[in-house]
Amino acid sequence: TVPTHMEEGEYDAEILPYKYTAHVTVDGRPLNLYAKVKTKFELQTWNATHRIQVGASWTYAKNLGDGQVYDLSRPLNPGSSYTRPRKYSDIPASEQIALFVEDQIGIPIGKHHLEVQAGIGSSMLLNLNSRYALSGKPYFDPRINAQWSFPAIGIGNNDLNINVSGGFGWLTKTPTLAQLYPNKLYMDFVQLNYWNANPDYKRMNLRTYIVDPVNYNLKAARNFKWEVRLGMEFHRNDFSITYFRERMSSGFRSMAN
């Protein structure tokens, strides 16, 4: 038997035949839009050269398809009744705006050279219901990287170049559409199960409850990372060693009730 209803209430289940042929069509019609603007300019302050980038981007993703289309009375997997078909077009679009500014600074210090790259990015999800904790909330991801290059050391006919670098920064990951808009759960409880050798007398009656697992309190996952690196270059051979540490104290996962 399989349920064929889409609403809460009491219904008779469909009695499946011993053999049947199931057909399914997956209708997906994705629409993806992307726009980006970026500008670069340079300026000089004392003996430092600044290469500055400023930009913004906008992304939009929507599926206009019908999703899985099949006869509910002839399912591919009759043992799976917790979900029902859902149109892709019923899922709201994913829309995000992002801004960034970055300054790459080059500073000669005697025969040494210091390169600093500092920037901050900001992103925010759009098209969210006001009940979501993420609605209208921007996240900021600052980051800094620096590299100190020492004077070249002559060894034979080649130079040994040594540099030390390090950096730290934040990275924000927002929930996916599947996490923001999960499928509803259908809880079908058998109220009556009468089995008879005569198919005309067989009957199963169900009481169905629908659970909406949407979590409006979802927040973005934040990841902090820092690293230090020693690099060497000699006669077209590169060697480097890096130590890094990454810490993420938040994230997403599915939990069964």
Walk through the language-model features, giving the residues of each.
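Structural signature of Gram-negative outer-membrane beta-barrels, strongest in the C-terminal barrel
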Residues: P30-N32, S57-T59, D90-D238, T242-R247
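A generic membrane alpha-helix/interface feature
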Residues: S73-N77, L185-M187, R253
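Face-selective signature of the C-terminal outer-membrane beta-barrel domain
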Residues: T1-R131
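Surface-exposed, extracytoplasmic segments of Gram-negative outer-membrane nutrient-acquisition systems
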Residues: R247-N257
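Short secondary-structure boundary/capping segments
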Residues: D71, L180-L185, A256-N257
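Polar low-complexity intrinsically disordered regions
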Residues: T1, V37, Q44-A48, I144-A146, ...
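Short aromatic-enriched loop/helix-cap "lid" or pocket-rim segments at secondary-structure transitions
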Residues: G67, L177-L180, F252-S254
